[in-house]
Structure formats: structure tokens, C-alpha cells
Amino acid sequence: MLKYRSLPIKRAIHHPAPGITPISPRIMVSRLRVIPSFNLKFNRWNSSVPESSKKELKTTDGNQESASKVSPVKEKEKVPFKVKMQKALRHYWDGSKLLGLEIKISSKLLMKSAAGYPLTRRENLQLKRTTQDIVRLVPFAAFLIIPFAELLLPFALKLFPNLLPSTYESSKKRENKLENLRNTRKLMSEIIKNNKSHFKPNNISEEQKALFNRFYTHVRATGVPESRQQLIEVARLFTDDTVLDNVTRPYLIALAKYMNLQPFGTDVMLRYRIRYKMLELKKDDLSIYYEDAEQLSLSELKTACASRGIRSVDVEPSVLYSNLRLWLNMRLKDKIPSTLLIMATAYNYGNVQSKESLYDALCDVLIGIPDELYHEVKVNVVKEDEASAKQKLKQLREQEEIMKEEEQQEENAIVSVKDELSLDDQDKNIDAAAPDVKPHDTKPIGEAAAIKEK
């Protein structure tokens, strides 16, 4: 088919010489079989060859590079502001309905508890979560009561993201919080490994002193304990209060961050908050023990493992179930302090997959005391009459320096906290309530299908 793309042909057709009748486009197409390609919209001549034919011609002519060029990636389309507003309003509306439903359910649970009926672990968690959400509404209500204060609400939510109840939290923010917690725990795990912990057992008998001395002599020589039973018996000598009262401030801060606590305040305040968190874990251990871990749903199982410092991301449900049962076994059957278990999970964070690994991590925690503290403990292990007065004087001066430092922190603190909470006394009550029999975690590990998924 003839194409008139050259400039002389175009001028001859549309601007003929004087005395020559111009050819209309219809006659030109029907008789001369010429395709007109003048674009009236853009007032320019266009090629009548399709784009696909152009590419074929280029490739046949040997121009392979231009044909094989990758088209640039299209940018993501911007969501209109109206759509964003509708999505945000729908999210807050759903959160308000969810909060109203939680208040309705929790009010029934509160009436049930006031009537004297016991609440299950799931009901206690629901009541606690709703109470925390209602408390969060108190500062949020100030923005609605004070005139024009709602204009500052976006800035307040940016600075304090936990100002709103948990029902308004989006899935993206929840994932960001979990990711930040995982990164923090990885970092704190390294800090706990590198920082030596300064704690030692107190008020132990002569037989326990001999066991303690034999354990450290064998471990420092071979790197492993004589038996697992020996490791458990030595770990029982370190009570929660003994550990928390003798660790340094960097270790306290790392421990608080690992347990998802804000590390602000003096050492006394940090110890009190860690003790309170440990007490909640002890009670939760007993609740899971009585109700059996098999009754937990998958989301509840992940939450329970995460609160104990056990990795719960990218882990099979059967492995999570095994790790939780191992924790309960070491906590309630072996009666190992929760503080040491938290440190053990921090030592091998993300690698708690067998009983040997967690017991080995517990051994690493006990080995991690410094040499000078080991010599100090060795003085306490032998009879008091054999200890020199110089060694006792050095130990007493160290305790005096710690007390002076804590007193100075309390003087500079705005809020004074009196730490009278004793985990050891609470531990005696919890251990007395737990029967000394094989707990549920001694049963064979179930499959992932046995775990109920909501």
C-alpha cells in the first residue's frame, strides 16, 4: 500500500499547482490506495504504521538493543485524600465498636468476680486488657473536653502512640512494635551475654556450699556440669530477690528492655517494676499449668511465649508448644527462679528448640559470674571462721558503695519508690499451691493440629 510521507507528496496533494483540481481523501484512498495519516487533532502528520509493526521492523533491521529495553517501573498510584479519610474513619469506627463490646463483656466478668466466682486465665486477661484501655481513655478525654484541644490531637498521637486504646491499633503498627521488640531483644541478648552478672546465693547450708563449690570447680575445669540434677540444685540456690538485688544497673536496664519495660527511673524503681512483671509471670505460669497449655489458641500461645522472652516469629506451633511446656517444667517442677529462666532465654534467643539448649543456656548464666565474684563466693562457701578479716572488709566496703549509690539516686529522683515487694515470699505461696507431681508438660508433644486456632 502506498504511503505519502515525503514532503513533496504532501504538498502536491493538499496544495496543488494552479489549474489542477485537488484530490479529495476519499478518491485518493479508493483510486490511488494511499493511506492518509494527517492527524487533525495535533495538526501534524503521523505514521500509519502500527507500533507493533515498528518494533518488528526495528528487530528485523538488527536494532536489538532498542527492542530489548525494559520499560520503566510504574510508580505506585497515590491514594486520594478522600479515600484515606474514609479508611481512617472506618478504622476508628470499628475500633469504637470493638471497645464497646469489650466493655460489655468485661462488665459481666467484673460482676462474676464480685459475686465470688473464679475467673479463668482467658477471662482475667480480657478484664485486664479492658481495664488498661479504659485507663488510656482518661487523658484522651481531655482533648475532647478542652475547647480547640482536638486540633492538637494528631500531634499528641504522633508523640504518644499508646494514647489510644488497643482496639484502635492497626495491624501495621502492631507488626512494627513486634519487630522493634525483636530487634531490642536481640541487642539486649548480646548485652546480657557480655555484661557479667554480680550475684551470689545467700543463707545456704554447709551441704549446699559444698555442692556450690564442687559445681564451679567442675564447670571451670570441663565447661559442663557433672549432671543436670546438679545444675538444677545449684540454680535453686539463686533466688529471684538475690539476683535482682545484686545485679548492676546496665544489667537491670538490659533485663527491663528484654522484658518490654521502659528502663526509666532509679535502680530501686527498675527492680520494683521487674519484680512486679516477674510476679505476673509466676501467676500466669500457674494458670497455664492448671488449665493445660493445650487449651491455648495459636495467638494466645504466641503471646505467652513472647511475654517469657521465647522467640515466637517464624516458629512452628508444635515448637512453640514444646518451648512453653519446657518453661513450665523448669519453673514449676524443677523450681528454677524465673529471673534465671529469663536470662537463659536471652542467652539463646531465637534458638530455644530443645531441652538441652535451654539447660545449657542456664549453665552459661551461672558460669557468667566474674572471677572476682567467684573468689568472693568461694569465701562464703567455706566456713566463716576460715575467711580472713581482709576479705570480709573488702566485701563490706563494696556493699557500702552500692548503698551510697542507691541513696544518691533516691535523693535526685522526683518520685521516691519503696521496693518492699519480695518475690521469694510470693514464690513460696505459688510453689505451695502447685502440687509436686509431673505437670502437663511431661506428656508427649502434640502436633500443630492439636492447637486450636481462632
UniProtKB/Swiss-Prot annotation:
Location(s), subcellular: Mitochondrion inner membrane
Quaternary data: Associates with the mitochondrial ribosomes.
Keyword field: Coiled coil, Membrane, Mitochondrion, Mitochondrion inner membrane, Transit peptide, Transmembrane, Transmembrane helix
UniProt keyword Cell membrane, yes or no: no
The organelle targeting sequence, given as a residue range: 1-45
Name recorded for this polypeptide: LETM1 domain-containing protein YLH47, mitochondrial
Mitochondrial matrix topological segments: 158-454
Organism name: Saccharomyces cerevisiae (strain ATCC 204508 / S288c) (Baker's yeast)
GO-annotated biological processes: potassium ion transport; protein insertion into mitochondrial inner membrane from matrix; proton transmembrane transport
Membrane topology: Single-pass membrane protein
Listed GO MF terms: ribosome binding
Residue ranges constituting the Letm1 RBD domain according to the UniProt record: 177-371
Top-level taxonomic group: Eukaryota
Protease listed as a keyword: no
Mitochondrial intermembrane side: 46-136
